[in-house]
């Protein structure tokens, strides 16, 4: 399990770090906030199409080759911007990185959920989510330092190197070709059947909106901080503090789940996060910004692991990978639509309304969660 988490940390750090260097490099090239929003949406364009297919592929073939292929495609995406220049290269990087991470992420979550019984599954997802938090710290901080000291091409090269240990390790080990239960090879099953199940449908929608809020913070914080003339290193530190708070929350999550249902914990965390989003753009002081980023990390830190665990528990037998792919497809619908809307909003009114829109979004879905 710990080797799985180590590979996940490396690939997730590459994914998150690329979003920061792509947005900052685009700003340096003179891109508008609308263009930044389209770039953010490009990360979700291929996953939007491939999400359900990737889940079916994992259910039918196992997890090993989708893990290898996903990491390799991400490496190729980074190398495009090492050797290419301009917005065209950045769009290609965003497209390939999003596609590769989709296959890797569906596989790693299916593999994690398939290890052990239901009680062990909760522990495994908690460990995986801690890994995600660690990579959320490593990615932004390392890429901020790399941009300031090595330039944008150097940062992309560093991120490409993050993907190499998982690729090499998985190529030489067959331990990770795992699926929970019998391989599901029924070609006639319909994904619409899953959406007709209210427990699955609700967690899919909620997951998409939670991830969109988290991703928008990672993508629009650099835009907002850039207007305040913060360096890439400082921006990385702010995102690192946000990630560190998520690590704390995820260590505490098993204790919280012993006393309250997952849905109640998620309700409290989402409402807590909404308050942080509402006040974030009111501060231009770095120390206040660090404090609010920590506050936000405490709230959002539980959202994604809880949605992963709840979705897996609600999956029909033999279709866990497909439900994971469906959930990630919903995540990417939100990642396409919301960044483009927010990009246009930011171009017209500035970055602050983007944060306030997130606050409204999280408040609304927190009460949807409360009703379940």
PLM regions: where:
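C-terminal membrane-cytosol helix-exit motif in multi-pass small-molecule transporters
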Residues: 160-181, 368-372
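Structural signature of the two symmetry-related core transmembrane helices
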Residues: 65-79, 160, 264-278
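Residue-level signature of mid-helix packing/kink "hotspots" within the transmembrane helices
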Residues: 44-52, 136-137, 243-247, 251, ...
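Juxtamembrane intracellular "pre-TM" segments in multi-pass secondary transporters
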Residues: 175-204
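Helix-to-loop junctions at the C-terminal end of transmembrane segments
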Residues: 50-62, 147, 249-261
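Cytoplasmic helix-loop-helix junction between adjacent transmembrane helices
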Residues: 95-131
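Helix-breaking motifs and short loop linkers at transmembrane-helix boundaries and internal kinks
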Residues: 62, 83-85, 282-284
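Helix-loop boundary and gating motifs at the non-cytosolic
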Residues: 1-44, 201-202, 211-224, 228
């Amino acid at each position: 399990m710990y080797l799985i988490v180590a590979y996940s940390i490396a690939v997730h750090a590459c994914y998150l770090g690329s979003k920061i260097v792509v947005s900052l490099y685009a700003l340096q090239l003179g891109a508008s906030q609308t263009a930044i929003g389209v770039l953010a949406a490009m990360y979700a364009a291929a996953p939007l199409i491939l999400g359900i297919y990737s889940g079916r592929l994992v259910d039918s073939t196992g997890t090993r080759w989708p893990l290898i292929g996903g990491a390799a495609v991400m490496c190729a995406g980074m190398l495009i911007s090492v050797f290419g220049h301009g917005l065209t290269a950045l769009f290609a990087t965003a497209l390939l990185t999003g596609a590769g991470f989709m296959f890797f992420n569906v596989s790693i979550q299916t593999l994690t959920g398939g290890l052990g019984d239901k009680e062990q599954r909760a522990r495994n997802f908690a460990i995986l989510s801690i890994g995600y938090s660690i990579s959320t710290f490593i990615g932004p901080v390392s890429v901020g330092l790399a941009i300031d000291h090595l330039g944008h091409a150097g940062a992309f090269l560093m991120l490409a190197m993050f993907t190499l240990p998982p690729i090499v390790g998985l190529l030489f080990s067959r331990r990770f070709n795992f699926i929970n239960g019998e391989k599901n090879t029924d070609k006639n099953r319909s994904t619409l059947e899953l959406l007709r199940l209210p427990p699955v449908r609700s967690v899919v929608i909620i997951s998409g909106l939670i991830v969109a809020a988290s991703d928008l913070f990672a993508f629009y914080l650099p835009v907002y901080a850039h207007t305040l003339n913060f360096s890439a290193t400082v921006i990385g530190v702010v995102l690192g503090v946000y990630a560190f708070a998520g690590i704390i929350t995820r260590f505490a999550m098993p204790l919280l789940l012993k006393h309250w249902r997952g849905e109640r914990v998620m309700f409290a965390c989402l409402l807590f996060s909404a308050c942080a989003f509402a006040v974030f753009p009111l501060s231009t002081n770095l120390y206040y910004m660090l404090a609010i980023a920590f506050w936000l990390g405490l709230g959002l830190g539980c959202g994604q692991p809880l949605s992963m665990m709840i979705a897996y528990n609600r999956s029909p037998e033999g279709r866990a990978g497909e439900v994971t792919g469906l959930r990630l497809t919903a995540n990417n619908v939100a990642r396409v639509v919301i960044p483009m809307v927010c990009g246009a909003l930011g171009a017209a009114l500035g970055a602050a309304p983007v944060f306030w829109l997130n606050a409204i979004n999280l408040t609304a879905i927190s009460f949807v969660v409360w009703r379940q």
